[in-house]
Every structure is written in structure tokens, then in C-alpha cells.
Amino acid sequence: MNLLQLSLSNLSLSPLSTAVNILLLSLGTGSIAILLIATHLLSAALIRDAADIDLVVGAKGSPLQLVLSGLYHADIPTGNIRLSEARTWMEHPMVESAIPLSLGDSHKGFRIVGTNEDYVDIYDGQLAEGKLPSNLLEIAIGSSVSKATGLSLGATFAGQHGLDGAGHAHDEDSYTVVGIFEASDTVLDRLLIT
């Protein structure tokens, strides 16, 4: 009797134990495969969202919080800095380009970002409908924002302070949706740009 025949004979003696072992091995292997795929997808998304960004400058506070809020828009901002302080960096001879961001308000959990067209260009943002904001209280929204909130061109809404939905609503100032971005699989899909 060779080793293969001996192994098969042993497996056939306890079919329930064999089936449970095969099931557990399959579940373990599947779990590891799912974790590896999820890690790869998350890593690719983080790299894609940080493309072409070398430095994040912001208010005093936690560097991690600054990166999470200013780059990935996944945390509460450390605060805004004065434009005069930002200009020091923006006009520095070693800085090729600088993009200002103003954070703090949201709509239904999606961050409202005050910035300029350069921010959209970093992510190769293309409009599916409408135009980029050019006037006060005009806003262009990401594809995920449009789907989740039901906002469309011409819709108006009031932003609210903070990200958690419990902040003060700015009912006195309503934004008007003037553009909707195409899906880009970047952070731009989850933002409202004004």
C-alpha cells in the first residue's frame, strides 16, 4: 500500500471529519483571499486619491488628522489657516502649484469643499452634466453624492456645519447645483465642490 492509498483509506474511514476539515480549509482560504483583495482595493484607492499631492499644509493639530481631512476627506478638519499664511506657501519659489481648500460644512454626510478648478484637475474630473461653479453658492457634486442624495441640476439645499448631520444648518444660504461630475473612482465622487 502506497502513501496515497493510505491517505484515501484514512479519509474514507471518517467522512464527517473529512467534510468538516475540507469546509474549514475552504472557509479559511476564502477569508484570506477576500482580505487580500480588500487590502489591494483599499490600497489602490488611497494611492489614487493621493496622486500628484506631495505636501498638505494646514492648521496646527494632528498631522494624521490633517492628511485624513485634507486629502481623503475622512476626518474632521484641524481648522482653516489665514489666506495670508497660505499665500506664503503658494508663492514660494519651490512650490510648483498650490490648491487652497476650505472645509467645515457638509450635506447629508458628504463634505462641501471650497476650492478652485485645479483641485478638480488633479483627479481628472469631468462633468457629466452642467458646469463648474463660477458664482457664490454654486456647487458641483460628485456622482456618489448625486446618487445618494437625489440632488440634480438646479436643486437647492442648505449646508450644515460639521460632518455628522447634527451641526447647525445654514438655512439662510442655499447652494444651487450647477454641475454633476462623472464617476471617477476617486475622492471627487464623494465631494461637493464650490
Language model region names:
Residues 36-111, 118-121, 135:
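Hydrophobic, regular-secondary-structure patches
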Residues 106-116, 126-194:
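Hydrophobic secondary-structure segments that place a key small or acidic residue at a functional site
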Residues 1-5:
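Short, membrane-interfacial amphipathic segments enriched in basic
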Residues 26, 30, 73-74, 133:
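Conserved short-loop catalytic and cofactor-binding motifs
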Residues 16-41, 45-46:
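Short, strongly hydrophobic transmembrane alpha-helices
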Residues 9-14:
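Helix-boundary and loop/linker segments of multi-pass membrane transporters
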